[in-house]
Amino acid sequence: MDNGEQELTARVISSYQKMGSDGKKRQILKLQTDDFTFYTIGSKSDDFRAGDSIFLSVINLDVSFKDYLASTFYMPSFSREKLPQKPAHSFNQKLQSLIYAQHENSKIAQLYSALFLGTNIDGELRDDVSNWGVAHLIAISGYHLGVISAVCFFILRLVFKPIYARYMPYRSYIFDFTIVIFLVLCFYFYMIGFIASFLRAFLMSVAGFYMICKKIKILNFYTLFGVILFSVALFPQLLFNVGFYFSCLGVFYIYVYLFYFAPKFSVLANSLLLNLYVFFAMEVAVLYFFPLISLLQFSVLAINYLFGVFYPLSFLLHLFGYGSIFDEILSKMLAFRLSSNNLHISTFVFLLYNAITLLCVKFKPTALLPPLFGVASFLLFLLNFS
């Protein structure tokens, strides 16, 4: 990038209001060019929505190499003009149009677009998602990959297993179905574009499949670290991606629970305790970046299970043109509020928390500390609330 002023054509990813440290609300625009994504501050007169194309001038003097490597940074801008809307050309844009056509409520349409296509969400919906604590369900990640894989496997098994049993009993249908599922996931990854959490989940799935074929132990922290390093080597900007950090941390805590605690309980108990463990263990990391805390966030413990049914069902409904069936329920749900507050985590506590997390690899007693940090966070909230 050349220093000084530069004229750009960019697409609006999201537009939302944010309260500044001086108490004033500002209009934040997240814009995407062919080479990078950046934030800028708009004016009250700007009327930009997600998907709009705009022409603007920016000042890039303060963009550091680290910021540019991260591919997401801030640049002041001026002379912002909305360009005439062009017909959707890409497959992704056409799918977005199909989703929006099924919903009168643009917020709900935006929610489904984020669920299925990994598009960004605006400020109001972002606040609703934070209030419920379901950001990990909205952002496409390993959870979605698991649901997609399970549904694909169920359909393939239902249709093709009898054929394999009669004509190809010597072949492993599980192996063949897994290859087909990976091809489906590759196409999905191409369609939705680069999403760090989905990339991590996909690479781990491939690594896990390879290890199963070679009869190598899967539950291994070094496998996880290897996939993380490989991902960063391919895409250095992941070092500065919060979503990638959350994704890796969530899987790490799943590994910790399965490694230390799962053998002591039944399958049913583990399905409940694993959910609780990861929820509390992740709390400090989430609060450090998104300090909103509310008792309503406990509902995610139940929503995690319901999502496994809702996600494929809502996809099928959209496929047949009935995507608006849950709109009224979702609108009321997103609007519902309980008392909330901002609980700010200091950098020292955050670094201590991460150091303890790494120690979990070698020392079992430390595996109890991250969820205890999370429990303490809610206790502090209750004390302040009372």
Regions found by a protein language model. Give the residues of each.
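Solvent-exposed, well-ordered amphipathic alpha-helical segments
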Residues: 4-13, 30, 34, 47-48, ...
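Short, functional N-terminal and low-complexity linear motifs
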Residues: 60-66, 172-177, 196-197, 267-269, ...
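Membrane-interface helix/helix-cap signal primarily in integral membrane proteins
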Residues: 1-136
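Internal transmembrane alpha-helical bundles of multi-pass membrane proteins
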Residues: 194-386
